[in-house]
From Swiss-Prot:
Protein name: Chaperone protein DnaK
InterPro entries in alphabetical order: ATPase_NBD, Chaperone_DnaK, Heat_shock_70_CS, HSP70_C_sf, HSP70_peptide-bd_sf, Hsp_70_fam
Entry annotated with the keyword DNA-binding: no
Region span, Disordered: 603-632
Induction line: By stress conditions e.g. heat shock.
Compositional bias (Basic and acidic residues): 615-632
Sorted UniProt keywords: ATP-binding, Chaperone, Nucleotide-binding, Phosphoprotein, Stress response
Modified residues (Phosphothreonine): 202
GO annotation, biological process: chaperone cofactor-dependent protein refolding; protein refolding
Organism: Aquifex aeolicus (strain VF5)
Entry function: Acts as a chaperone.
Family matches, as Pfam families: HSP70 (PF00012)
Length: 632
């Protein structure tokens, strides 16, 4: 009998929402989460009780408890605090530098600094658990997608998040590449496809070529601050301004109102994708401070009005499409197929502009929210040996190089080079008798080193003293299939070499990862115990309610000694529900309540029998008997 293959799941860890998928036979199946939804909001919230909420329950707290609810953490993963100062102003929680200068979150209810990797891990763990429930077996490996523009630090940080969640990330995959796989591009001959990915928080365009089992990403472009959230904000701002004109009240100062407005704006946007107008109705949105009377918000929003509001946003996406085509030296007519990815592509104006620009209908065969996760599942299937005949070629989105004499960036790997790739160049010393050289690794498109992103610095020492230009230093850049960069510098005269994995400069150390994993495991055990205690208290509370109800309805039919015993145990149970910290305490009192309930049920049953035999009122006794039965 053939050994069962270990399942590898595919995960789209999105800025706004995340999705998990797995190959079942020849099909990528999207898995529902614990709430029964295929979309899981990428939101984590910490309560005062130290409970950690993930997904939809956390999203509902985003405005009610903004300091303790982290959303769009993907914007900060693998980045230095200095790089994200502007980003930090856009969120309601506090972004601070950690001891290494990396971006972290100061969450009061967490009682510590929380790193973006930890937030990502909470979301990934929820998706992992959903997959395990669906498959009925443990899941240990995953393919996780990232935006095409993610640099090496961000990719490594995403892998760290997976490790914290208990997942071995066997491949990091560019989101547009995943979409191409989901659409079966590899099955077509000589096809050019443009992936237009308009998600909740980011916008990406990729141009790919495929045929004969090969997928190659040629060009990527994008804007990390363009997404469906911008459209929601436009609707929300309009509602706030309209309400202010009518009442003089600014709803921005009311957190509860803002949460409701945010949800209503998102819902209105979705409805206007298939309706010409929608009514936004928010009763009791606030209180009039002058009359102390409740105020209601009721507005009609038409599709035409929405399109006016968001025209510039859609225009910006088309500008980025033009930039990608220019980079690829292509015209719109050179594109064979346009693929729409991301929930925002459901908006009719988006589809209309794409159709006008390319002169053809965009391809909409798959759910745009799920297509990336499905592609990740297909790649996972390839790695697990379940799917054959796909060769995947990703590209590096930005040029990579080193700083050379005079502060110039010398490029080793140009932008849009297919990966995996290895490139080497020979350099020499800039000064006489130089015994060491600094290797400064850079990423970007600017000619001067200072204008590009610094990825890492390391030193090659022990070079024999010689006149400048004599030593030969070979520098090799090696990008693996996950887009992680390895840099090696070797003195060809002595054979001495030094190397660096670029992500280490900003990622978590192995010790930190282990600590976070340990913390997460300890927290999971606490969560399980907490959940069991709450469930036990709920059961006890239900039994107490039934017993009180039976006592009240039976009235004087309950003997005094039984009634006294029941009242005592009810009092004890209520105190236990309020104060118990151990499940055993609750179980002991639950047993007492069940015993008293049983005794009372037996007594009432006997009394009812006597009444029936004596020709007394049967109806009243019957009701007491029926109500008493569930207590047994």
């Amino acid at each position: 009998m053939a050994e069962k293959k270990e399942k590898i799941i595919g995960i789209d860890l999105g800025t706004t929402n995340s999705v998990v998928s797995v190959m079942m036979g020849d099909e990528a199946v999207v898995i529902q989460n614990q709430e029964g939804s295929r979309l899981t909001p990428s939101v984590v919230s910490w309560t005062k009780e130290k409970e950690i909420l993930v997904g939809e329950p956390a999203k509902r707290r985003a405005i009610l408890d903004p300091e303790n609810t982290v959303y769009e953490s993907k914007r900060f993963i693998g980045r230095k605090f200095e790089e994200v100062k502007e980003e930090a102003k856009r969120v309601s929680y506090k972004v601070v530098p950690d001891e290494k200068g990396d971006a972290a979150f100061d969450i009061p209810n967490a009682g510590k600094l929380v790193r973006p990797e930890e937030v990502g891990a909470h979301v990934l763990r929820k998706l992992k658990e959903a997959a395990e429930a669906f498959l009925g077996e443990p899941v240990k490996k995953a393919v996780i997608t990232v935006p095409a523009y993610f640099n090496e630090r961000q990719r490594q940080a995403t892998k760290d998040a997976g490790k914290i969640a208990g997942l071995e990330v066997v491949r990091i995959l560019n989101e547009p590449t995943a979409a191409a796989m989901a659409y079966g591009l590899h099955k077509k001959d000589n096809v050019r496809i443009l992936v237009y990915d308009f998600g909740g928080g980011t916008f990406d365009v990729s141009i790919l070529e495929g045929g004969e089992g090969v997928i190659e990403v040629k060009v990527t472009a994008g804007d990390t601050h363009l997404g469906g959230a911008n459209i929601d904000e436009r609707i929300m701002d309009w509602l706030i301004e309209e309400f202010k004109k009518e009442t003089g009240i600014d709803l921005r100062k009311d957190r509860t109102a803002l949460q409701r407005l945010k949800e209503a704006s998102e819902q209105a946007k979705k409805e206007l994708s298939f309706k010409m107008e929608t009514e936004i109705n928010l009763p009791f949105i606030t209180i009039d401070p002058n009359t102390n009377q409740p105020l209601h918000l009721q507005k009609k929003l038409t599709r035409a009005r929405l399109e006016e509001m968001i025209k510039d946003i859609v225009d910006r996406t088309i500008d980025i499409v033009k930039q990608a085509l220019e980079d690829a030296k292509l015209k719109p007519s050179d594109i064979d197929e346009v693929v729409l990815v991301g929930g925002s592509t459901r908006i009719p104006l988006v589809q209309q502009r794409i159709k006008e620009f390319f002169g053809k209908e965009p391809h909409k065969g798959l759910n745009p929210d799920e297509v990336v996760a499905m592609g990740a599942a297909i790649q996972a299937g390839v790695l697990a040996g379940e799917v054959k005949e796909i060769v995947l070629v990703d590209v590096t989105p930005l040029s990579l190089g080193v700083e050379t004499y005079g502060g110039v960036m010398t490029v080793l790997i140009p932008r849009n080079t297919p990966i995996p790739v290895r490139k080497c160049e020979i350099f020499t010393t800039a000064h006489d008798y130089q015994t060491e050289v600094e290797i400064h690794v850079l990423q970007g498109e600017r000619p001067l080193a200072k204008d590009n992103k610094s990825l890492a610095k390391f030193y090659l020492t022990g070079i024999p003293p010689a006149p400048r230009g004599v030593p030969k230093i070979e520098v090799c850049f090696d990008i693996d299939a996950d887009g992680i960069l390895h840099v090696t510098a070797k003195d060809l005269g002595t054979g001495k070499e030094q190397s660096v994995r670029v992500e280490i400069s900003s990622g978590l150390t192995p010790e930190e990862i282990e600590r976070i994993i340990k913390e997460a495991e300890e927290h999971a055990e606490e969560d399980r115990k907490k959940k069991e205690l709450i469930e036990a208290k709920n059961q006890l509370d239900h039994l107490v309610y039934q017993l009180e109800k039976a006592l009240k309805e039976a009235g004087d039919k309950v003997p005094a000694d039984v009634k006294s015993e029941a009242e005592k145990v009810i009092e004890e149970a209520k105190k236990t529900i309020e104060t118990a910290t151990e499940i055993e305490q609750v179980k002991q009192v639950t047993e007492k309540v069940l015993q008293v309930s049983s005794k009372m049920g037996t007594t009432l049953y006997g009394e009812a029998g006597k009444q029936a035999g004596g020709g007394e009122k049967k109806d009243e006794g019957g009701e007491g008997e029926v109500e008493a039965k569930p207590v047994d």
